[in-house]
A protein has these predicted regions:
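Sec-dependent bacterial lipoprotein signal peptides
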Residues: 1-6
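N-terminal capping/linker segments that flank leucine-rich repeat
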Residues: 8-70, 79, 109-111, 115-261, ...
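Inter-repeat linker/turn residues at the boundaries of leucine-rich repeats
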Residues: 51, 72-75, 95-98, 130-133, ...
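Conserved LRR concave beta-strand detector
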Residues: 55, 76-81, 101-104, 134-139, ...
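Canonical leucine-rich repeat
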Residues: 56, 65-71, 90-96, 113-119, ...
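Per-repeat beta-strand-to-loop junction in leucine-rich repeat
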Residues: 59, 83-84, 104-107, 139-142, ...
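Canonical position 11/12 of the leucine-rich repeat
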Residues: 62-64, 86-88, 109-111, 145, ...
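Ankyrin-repeat and related helical/solenoid repeat scaffolds used for protein-protein interactions
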Residues: 88, 93-142, 344, 350-417
Length: 466
């Protein structure tokens, strides 16, 4: 770290410069424009301007967070405005010099606040929270309302100082106005509010979720199921349960009021205890599965906003034995239906994956999805896809099913049937198999899951090609 307040003098001992030199050219340009002076080596002239600088406005400059450590060249700087700099989704407090205790992060899209606090959780659930950076002022963007892991714990740890005004902690509202930070969050949809109050009452303070509260044992592991009959059209507020570090439910199943009523939902980050995610008729731009290491099943249907679905973080999906993966209840499953702008699907990067079900249909924008490392799948359904998509089929080597009839039941749409890769897949696993082979590789079905896609009679079409 650069030495704070250290300086060096020129030969006539009349000028003093910072020991640390600026390395970031963007930062140097900004500071020169503000009237600061540097020598040819990049050392800051410690004149009255530099020595009297206690606050520095870098808002709207888009300055890289990697340059922030160089601000330690200012001997008396304690407060920096970093608003509207395009930061996000994370901000790392470790990049700030220790001397800076006041920071304005408003106008950025930051969800995670790394190295603000450290948290040690005991076996009984008790937490020890330690501040990693001294803070006297913390102004936060509206997106900070989503963060529980860092900010709520910081707030709880420093509540006395915040209440007394020793720490000035504020957060902008949806209109961009600074408000006193609070752990209370609204649930706008009355039906969702009723559901959450009924099933997760421990989180509430009146009609608001209080992020500082913990869930009791009976609610801590309760599964999240919002059914169509619950008539939810806005899932704002659900993230405060899904991302709550004190909720350990294994399943998330969210359905809108109906197929003709697409519900809105904020982006969510799924926790490490989740094994199943179902989202139907819900518009959400991002489903972050980076912590979902136990995820075994994902079903996303009718999502007009999702562009990427990444299951690669799971240490469970497709990695069981053939008996487990061939079971309809316990086997790995992926269903992605009716997501018109989805571009990418990723599976775990293992040499051999086994699954119970893979079903992809009506994905008009799909560009990337490689199934070649899938060596066993009990049910494979491929509907209409982007016509320019390079469809890479599973390279099947394991043929197992509980009914003993066929290793893989296969269904496809007519458009998919005529793809070259489908013809090659059928040739390798159905048309050209050895008649003496006792293993039936492909079983026939013409049924697809998605009502906007029609399965074809691919056996009939094969016979017509003879």
């Amino acid at each position: 770290m650069l030495l704070i307040g250290a300086s060096c003098s020129d030969d006539d001992n009349t000028l003093s410069y910072s020991t640390g030199a600026v390395q970031n050219t963007e930062l140097k340009t900004i500071l020169v424009q503000r009237g600061y002076t540097f020598n040819e080596d990049g050392n800051l002239l410690l004149d009255d301007l530099a020595n009297n600088t206690t606050t520095l406005d870098l808002s709207g400059t888009q300055i890289s967070t990697d340059a922030l450590a160089e601000l330690s060249m200012f001997p008396n700087l304690t407060d920096v405005d970093l608003s509207d700099n395009g930061y996000g989704p994370a901000f790392d407090f470790a990049k700030l010099p220790e001397q800076i205790t006041g920071i304005d992060l408003t106008g950025n899209e930051i969800y995670d606040y790394d190295n603000l606090v450290s948290v040690v959780v005991e076996e009984n659930g008790d937490e020890t929270v330690t501040n990693l950076h001294e803070i006297t002022k913390l102004y936060l963007p509206e997106t900070a309302k989503e963060n529980i892991e860092d900010l709520v714990r910081f707030y709880r740890q420093n509540k006395e100082a915040i209440t007394a005004g020793t720490i000035d902690m504020k957060m902008t509202d949806v209109d961009g106005n600074l408000q006193t930070y609070t752990t209370l969050r609204d649930v706008p949809d009355a039906n969702l509010l009723t559901y959450l109050q009924t099933n997760f009452a421990d989180l509430f303070n009146g009609d608001q979720i209080d992020l500082s509260k913990h869930l009791g044992l009976d609610q801590k592991t309760k599964e999240l199921l919002v059914a169509p009959a619950d008539n939810v059209t806005n899932f704002e507020g659900i993230q405060f349960l899904v991302e709550n570090p004190y909720w350990e439910g294994a399943k998330i199943s969210l359905y809108s009021a109906g197929e003709e009523s697409i519900a809105s939902m904020p982006n969510i980050k799924v926790g490490k205890f989740i094994t199943q995610v179902i989202l139907q008729n819900i518009e959400v731009e991002d489903i972050d599965l980076s912590n979902a290491t136990d995820l075994r099943s994902a079903w996303v249907q009718n999502n007009p906003a999702l562009q990427k679905l990444d299951l690669s973080y799971s240490t469970i999906w497709g990695q069981g034995d053939k008996e487990t993966e061939g079971n309809g209840t316990y086997g790995s499953s992926l269903m992605v239906l009716g997501c018109p702008i989805l571009k990418e699907i990723k599976l775990p990067e293992k040499n051999e994956l086994k699954a119970y079900r893979i079903d992809i249909e009506c994905l008009d924008a799909l560009e990337t999805f490689d199934m070649s490392n899938v060596k066993m799948v009990a049910e494979l359904s491929i509907g209409d896809l982007n016509k320019d998509f390079n469809l890479v089929y599973p390279e099947l080597t394991i043929f197992y099913s509980e009914d003993g009839y066929a290793g893989t039941y296969f269904a496809c749409s007519e458009n998919t049937f005529y793809r070259e890769s489908t013809q090659a897949f059928l040739k390798a696993n159905y048309t050209d198999i050895d008649p003496d082979d006792t293993v039936r590789r492909l079983g026939y079905t013409s049924s697809l899951s998605y009502d906007k896609n029609k399965g074809c009679r691919w056996r009939t079409l094969l016979n017509k090609q003879k």
